[in-house]
Each structure stands twice: as structure tokens, then as C-alpha cells.
């Protein structure tokens, strides 16, 4: 079970809603993934109508919605978007995203910390998308964020855990859940994140752009379950030397 703020989730896989060929395919993939927390960009939905093509099927699916502030370039813009989302969707949960450069979509650490502190004070449950910076993640935790969401690689790049060394430090020092977000490209990346101690992963592009998104979503579900189970089972330690799994000479000596 995964506990974040006032909610509990059975699944350690969070999913997004972008880049799918259709709303139907999006919903089928989310169901196949087993995900119970789904992000959606406020700029992509009509907040005035719950029969929006993206919003309506998500509400019907019964998942927890995590609106994000993707598109915001400053703390002020993100705070404004957060209040719109809370008013329209009736949730104080928020994925905080601030990336001023559309080419790289890297999170702005200064604006993110500033917005996070304000939003927490205003009663939001803040899950910030941030760089894999252990110092920043600790500061975000200290201002009251319910979890931290450091990137594995740039958004949509499918490069995997390029920031692994920093992620390990973040995980080791965190007292709130760590959700690896962005860059996860194949199920094995997700399994590795859970094995190394992450509490969850958020996957969007890798599922949405696959030739078969529904089966890819299933693969990610199984990978996350496997990674979590492997961590709980306690992997053996690594070694630079070979260690025989059975005696090498006893049977020869016995037959001599």
C-alpha cells in the first residue's frame, strides 16, 4: 500500500493522459495499468464541463485525478492554475509543474520551491515535479510537500533513469514518498526505480506512444509489481568476485 497525504493506493504506478490517439484508448490503457492516480494538464480540458472528452471518461473510471500545472512558466502562473483546478474539480491535490523552456521542459527549481511553499500554506496537497536534486527535494519536503517527483530523464525522452545516482540519494534521505517522474521509457526502467527504493513511478509517453498502448500499460503494471516485490524480498549483495552456488571439488574428491 502507498500512502500519500490523506489517500492510500494499491498501485504504485501513476499514469498520465497526454499523447493518446483517442480518449477511449486512454481509458483502456489506464484500466490495464491498474493505476489509481492519473494526472491531467489543466490546459487540455474544458473545466466548465464535466462531459469534456478527457475529463468525463476519467471521472467515470473512478480514478483519483491529479491536475497539473504544465504550461506554467512562473510560480504565479502555477498558483493561478492550481486555484482554477481546485474550483473546477473539487480537489486540493496538485502536481506542481513549472518549466519555462518549452524545448527541454526542465523544471525551474526556484519557482517550484516558491510556488510549493505558497500552495501548501493555501491548503493544497502538493506533489512537485522537480529535478533530481537531493537538496531541492529536501527543501520541498521541509515546506510541506506530500511527496516529491524527481525526474529520471527529460519529459517524453524515454531515456530511463539517467539520474540514478541522485535518485538514490533522494530516496535514502526522504521522509515523504518519492515518485520517479519523466523519462521512463520501458517497463524495465520502472522496475529498476521500484527496486532501488522509489515508492512509485509516473508513466505517460512510454504507454501512449507504444504500438499497443493497452498491452504496454499491462507490462508496466507487472514491472512495477515485480520491482516492488523484488525490493521487499531483499536482493543479494553485489560482488566483484565469483561465488559458487554449489561445491566445486567435493564430488571429485569423493570419487577418487
Curated annotation (Swiss-Prot):
Its Enzyme Commission number?
2.8.1.10
Record Pfam families: ThiG (PF05690)
The terms under GO molecular function for this entry are: thiazole synthase activity
Q: Which GO terms describe its biological process?
A: thiamine diphosphate biosynthetic process
Main location (coarse class): cytoplasm
Which InterPro entries does this entry report, sorted A to Z? Aldolase_TIM (IPR013785), Thiazole_synthase_ThiG (IPR033983), ThiG (IPR008867)
Family from the record = Belongs to the ThiG family.
User: What role does this protein play?
Assistant: Catalyzes the rearrangement of 1-deoxy-D-xylulose 5-phosphate (DXP) to produce the thiazole phosphate moiety of thiamine. Sulfur is provided by the thiocarboxylate moiety of the carrier protein ThiS. In vitro, sulfur can be provided by H(2)S.
- This one is known as Thiazole synthase
